[in-house]
């Protein structure tokens, strides 16, 4: 569930952005953007020239120079406004997070148990390693791990999701976030961070942009823009002696106007806004990125590692069939499977009980009256079951049951081996049931592949992105599900070490890898991946290892993260193409206006039929400023994203933004020229 989206132009944000745009007119603020600093310097110079002309210190048209100066200042202001508006949207999102932070007191325990003596201390004084007791109705005062107890927790202030979640000691659901509220019961929490380092603090800092640094692609593009600016600066500087030698020197005002129109001011003015807006869009998807670098890396990803359960399949495997061993009837198998599952609260365990009831009317037994000993599932044993009336019933993975049978002096039947293989080939997960050393048969657990997922993978394949399914299932089951889902490859019987090795293998081939994870055992792979989306419901170790956190804890979100990253890169590339293509029309407007008096042959370049040299220069400068305002919505929302191959995407952008960058200025400059003529300003 995503939090409330801000309108693109909220009135409150517009007013604040206008104020911030004026504040950014200082030289120190402008120096951060070399392209716009040149425009700022040109604005200052033409302002001084206007004042000198008004006071009669130098000759020239004060009106013409003044209008040029005014629109150069507008160009700087519009660029500042774009950046301030993007930052304002992020700050508004940060302010909503700040509302979660409350000054509160915490019960700091003197020993790590719920009945230990407690001291009431301000939450801000809690340090890493402190133990606190939190009861129903309390705000959790710090990020940490639950070491005792279990409780229902309202995380809506962080995630936007109204449904409460369970947090309890042990397992992958022990991580809690400061600022969330306990609805019932109590928790003993070990604080895992110091003041100012909480997840909420980091979220606020990231969203506000306090930690925003330019990404590698942004730096590379900035260097390109600086290089183009230097080239045009040198070219413009040589035009004055060139025109003076011809007997009619071009004025400094015209040269400044020419320089500003030729340098890539459009992308220069919007570049910062695009980066800030990319992180803001990521937050709109309920994903917190640690930096713009992470968002950018998401756009460059070409390998996705996707967990099968919850991402590719619905994640609620259901018992679909009982397949007895030779000499065993199906009812006997169903009865044993149901007994072994009575204390199994997993969806799979409950589905086995229900299937036995539906098939053979085997009613669920009263657990208390059985006087049985239940054997829980563990990662080591990989099986669970029940000991009742001298009967020892177990269900589990094929390998685990085989070891169990052989250790009890039995043998694993060949017909059951064949049944296991048949179930796996159909994409189901086989569980084997055994009583003592006698194998009774196989339970087929069927997981459903999500609707539409195959089409999404086909779109990713068009974009050159390889999809790899990660699963703990055996190779046959994994191969069947992979074929049904349409992924490019799979890793079966996955372990943390195998995932880490796979990521390193792809990276050694020069690929960028993205993955999701929520457990402590995922932390090494998350730390190695280029884009690592940790689930908010996961452990502290997983969240610290990732460079993004999904507040919705939805593994499928990884695909959306890649889309947002690619959209940011496409927006930057498209507007750069548009900005550079713009120069052609401005060239046809200003060059004839500036030099036709010296070289009449250049009038042939006035293909737009502009009214006069002054109107041509004014029209180009005004268009140069206004186009920034018109492109702000595109910079903030991002260009329309379509899953295409790199070559198809390049062709599309060249047609839309390259050709558009050529045509739009011709039309815009001509329209402005006509208006200036009608107003008598030409």
From Swiss-Prot:
Classification via NCBIfam families = ATPase_P-type, kdpB
The protein's name: Potassium-transporting ATPase ATP-binding subunit
> What gene name does this entry carry?
kdpB
Q: How does this protein assemble?
A: The system is composed of three essential subunits: KdpA, KdpB and KdpC.
The membrane topology noted for this protein in its Swiss-Prot or TrEMBL record is: Multi-pass membrane protein
The protein's job, in short, is: Part of the high-affinity ATP-driven potassium transport (or Kdp) system, which catalyzes the hydrolysis of ATP coupled with the electrogenic transport of potassium into the cytoplasm. This subunit is responsible for energy coupling to the transport system and for the release of the potassium ions to the cytoplasm.
PROSITE patterns named among the record's database cross-references: ATPASE_E1_E2 (PS00154)
Q: Which species does this protein come from?
A: Salmonella heidelberg (strain SL476)
Q: Where does Mg(2+) bind?
A: 518, 522
């Amino acid at each position: 569930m995503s939090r409330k989206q801000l309108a693109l132009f909220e009135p409150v944000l517009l007013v604040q952005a206008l104020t911030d745009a004026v504040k950014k007119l200082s030289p120190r603020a402008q120096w951060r953007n070399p392209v716009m600093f040149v425009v700022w310097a040109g604005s200052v110079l033409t302002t001084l020239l206007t004042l000198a002309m008004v006071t009669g210190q130098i000759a020239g048209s004060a009106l013409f120079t003044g209008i040029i100066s005014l629109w150069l200042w507008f160009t700087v202001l519009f660029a500042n406004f774009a950046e301030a508006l993007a930052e304002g949207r992020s700050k508004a999102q940060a302010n909503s997070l700040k509302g979660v932070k409350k000054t509160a007191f915490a019960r700091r325990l003197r020993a790590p148990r719920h009945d230990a003596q407690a001291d009431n201390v301000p939450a801000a004084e809690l340090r890493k390693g402190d133990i606190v007791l939190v009861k129903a109705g309390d705000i959790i005062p710090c990020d940490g791990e639950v070491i005792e107890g279990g409780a229902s927790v309202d995380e809506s202030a962080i995630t936007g999701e109204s449904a409460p979640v369970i947090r309890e000691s042990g397992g992958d659901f022990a991580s809690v976030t400061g600022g969330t509220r306990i609805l019932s019961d109590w928790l003993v929490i070990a604080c895992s961070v110091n003041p100012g380092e909480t997840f909420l603090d980091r979220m606020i800092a990231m969203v506000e942009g306090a930690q925003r640094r330019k990404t590698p692609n942004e730096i590379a593009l900035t260097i390109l823009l600086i290089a183009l600016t230097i080239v045009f600066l040198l070219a413009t500087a040589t035009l004055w002696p060139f025109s003076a030698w011809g007997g009619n020197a071009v004025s400094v005002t015209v040269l400044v106007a020419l320089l500003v129109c030729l340098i890539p001011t459009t992308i220069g003015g919007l570049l910062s806004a695009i980066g800030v807006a990319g992180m803001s869009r990521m937050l709109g998807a309920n994903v917190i990125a640690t930096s713009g670098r992470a968002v950018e890396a998401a756009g460059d990803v070409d390998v996705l590692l996707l967990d099968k359960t919850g991402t590719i399949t619905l994640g609620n495997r259901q018992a679909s069939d009982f397949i007895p061993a030779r000499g065993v009837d199906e009812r006997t198998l169903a009865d044993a499977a149901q007994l072994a599952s009575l204390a199994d609260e997993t969806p799979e365990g409950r589905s086995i009980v229900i299937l036995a009831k539906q098939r053979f009317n085997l009613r669920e037994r009263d657990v208390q009256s059985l006087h049985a000993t239940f054997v829980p599932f563990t990662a080591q044993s990989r099986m669970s079951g029940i000991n009742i009336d001298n009967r020892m019933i177990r269900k589990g993975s094929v390998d685990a049951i085989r070891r169990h049978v052989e250790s009890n002096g039995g043998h694993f039947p060949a017909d059951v081996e064949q049944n296991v293989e048949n179930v796996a080939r159909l994409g189901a997960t086989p569980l084997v049931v055994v009583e003592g050393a006698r194998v009774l048969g196989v339970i087929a657990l069927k997981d459903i592949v999500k609707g539409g997922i195959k089409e999404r993978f086909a779109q990713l394949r068009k974009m050159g992105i390889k999809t790899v399914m990660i699963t703990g299932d055996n190779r046959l089951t994994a191969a069947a599900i992979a074929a049904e889902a349409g992924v490019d490859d799979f890793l079966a019987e996955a372990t943390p070490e195998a995932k880490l090795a796979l990521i390193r293998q792809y990276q050694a081939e020069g690929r960028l890898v993205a993955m999701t994870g929520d457990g402590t055992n995922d932390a090494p792979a998350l730390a190695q991946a280029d884009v690592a989306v940790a689930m908010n419901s996961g452990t502290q170790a997983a969240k610290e290892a990732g460079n993004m956190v999904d507040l919705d804890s939805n593994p499928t979100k990884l695909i959306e993260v890649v889309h947002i990253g690619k959209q940011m890169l496409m927006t930057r590339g498209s507007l750069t193409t548009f900005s550079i293509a713009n120069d052609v029309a401005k060239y046809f407007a200003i060059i004839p206006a500036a030099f036709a008096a010296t070289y009449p042959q250049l009038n042939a370049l006035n293909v737009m039929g502009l009214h006069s040299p002054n109107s041509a220069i004014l029209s180009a400068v005004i268009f140069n400023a206004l186009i920034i305002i018109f492109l702000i919505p595109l910079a903030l929302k991002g260009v329309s994203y379509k899953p295409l191959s790199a070559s198809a995407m390049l062709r599309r952008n060249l047609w839309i933004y390259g050709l558009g960058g050529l045509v739009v200025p011709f039309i815009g400059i001509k329209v402005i020229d006509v208006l200036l003529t009608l107003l008598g300003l030409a």
